[in-house]
Amino acid sequence: MDKNNVIGLSPENYGKFDFIVIPTNHLHLSGFTCRGDEDVRERAALWCSRLDSLLEQDLPFYKVGVAHLTDTGIMGGRGYLEALSIISDEDYIRLFRKATRRGVGIELNFNWLKTNDDDVEIHLRPYRIAKEEGCKFYLGSDAHALHVFKDMKDNFTKISALLGLEDKDKFVI
């Protein structure tokens, strides 16, 4: 999505894809997705408003996944963790209820193997709320190189266990 919340796929092409993955938090693309000089509170607000905007669009949500909601694309360094932490439960609940109503999939892809315990809890909080609100999940490695796949099974097994995911929680296309 660009800074005007326009996704990079035109409606006439939706039918050409079995699955459409849309990242709402690529805020590291200064000038394209955001101004680039936002503070943590502004980035948290952008996280919410961009997901909300996506959920308002006329999309084939039965085959749309929202990519890597808790990754560093929100803000560099530890800023992304702070931004995720200051989003209220009420905002998460509102957004994930809407996601459930729309039928969109929520991607799980953070790397718990390289994340300390306190930070894992920051990552898990929105996903726990999403699960409570009835969202469905899919796994995405976001791998940019083959060696990344080496630990993915362990990673996803652990994330699924931490969230208590069952077959009924799967996003099925």
Roles of regions detected by a PLM:
Residues M1-R102:
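Extended substrate/RNA-proximal surfaces in nucleic-acid metabolism proteins
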Residues G79-I173:
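Charged catalytic cores and adjacent phosphate/nucleic-acid-binding surfaces used
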